[in-house]
Amino acid sequence: MRKKSLYKMFIVAGVAAMMMTGCGSDKNKDTDTNASKTEAPADNNEADDEENYDTGDASLDNTRNQDEIGENELLVVSFGTSYNDSRRLTIGAIEDAMEKEFSNNFSVRRGFTSQIIIDHVKKRDNVTIDNITEALDRAVDNGVKKLVIQPTHLMNGLEYDELSEEVAKYASNFDKVAIGEPLHTSDEDFDTVMKAITDATKDYDDGKTAICFMGHGTEADSNQVYAKMQ
């Protein structure tokens, strides 16, 4: 699996997912929160606030924690969100796109980095989502030999570092392990993302609609990606 091929699929799927959940114009007034690329401070607010309204049908989301993985696995790692519709239309859309592209060679599975989100979904909806350790244990138990991990993180922040450290502990259990880079890594990545979001939002360029892309930021030096995108 070539890195650029995976990058392209990640970017296109990610932009498509954002558009499916609304851009803030009259064409779609519903708003969702996609926390898959954020840092930990969002956990408590999301888990507490959503109890006041319906977040969608959890049963429609494929948690991708099934066994019978095979020898090759593509593990898609996200921060996670407990908003059911948002999880299905954003994180799920990225996973579905990767499965469509690489299903001949890899089984696609899911792992979330936010344990608070995982616990909240389990308590509220009785839906089980693997954390990173559980996802890696599942890969080992299923005899996976080649493990490719693609995070949906926006930048090389604290969570990406923690992911890399956790994966390193399991490296000896596989014949080959590869971890994809975050969305914004090289100058070429920035150009690709800017073109993708411009193309995806061009129908809203009517001189009246403002589109704002938001992120929670990070304490890591990689927070500079926001200024660079501006």
Model regions: which residues?
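Bacterial N-terminal signal peptides that target proteins for export
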Residues: 2-10
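Alpha-helical transmembrane segments
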Residues: 13-17
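C-terminal motif of bacterial Sec signal peptides marking the signal peptidase cleavage site
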Residues: 18-22
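Active-site-proximal alpha-helix that buttresses catalytic centers in soluble enzyme cores
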Residues: 24-230
